[in-house]
């Protein structure tokens, strides 16, 4: 009876890297308005663990759910999709 637990993963953009070993990731999703039918964007911010402080603002990253690491942090950055382009 060894059941594997499904791990939730999300993709988002790092909006803040000012904390030590933590980044703030903005995850956007598209939702259809229940009455008017227009597709609208909804977003939510997650604090994610970044052990080596390697991700910077603007990076597109993949985060996965984990055990609670602090009061507000229950996600871990698992991969980099795209580096931020510097202007």
From Swiss-Prot:
Any one GO BP annotation for this protein: translation
Pfam families assigned to the protein according to its UniProt record, in alphabetical order: Ribosomal_S17
CC terms in the record's Gene Ontology section: cytosolic small ribosomal subunit
Subunit note: Part of the 30S ribosomal subunit.
UniProt keywords, alphabetically: Ribonucleoprotein, Ribosomal protein, RNA-binding, rRNA-binding
InterPro entries (UniProt xref): NA-bd_OB-fold, Ribosomal_uS17, Ribosomal_uS17_bact/chlr, Ribosomal_uS17_CS
Species in which this protein is naturally found: Chromobacterium violaceum (strain ATCC 12472 / DSM 30191 / JCM 1249 / CCUG 213 / NBRC 12614 / NCIMB 9131 / NCTC 9757 / MK)
Full protein name: Small ribosomal subunit protein uS17
CDD domains in UniProt: Ribosomal_uS17
Record has Aminoacyl-tRNA synthetase as a keyword: no
UniProt similarity note: Belongs to the universal ribosomal protein uS17 family.
Biological role stated in the UniProt entry: One of the primary rRNA binding proteins, it binds specifically to the 5'-end of 16S ribosomal RNA.
Cross-referenced SUPFAM superfamilies: Nucleic acid-binding proteins (SSF50249)
Superkingdom of origin: Bacteria
A GO molecular-function descriptor: structural constituent of ribosome
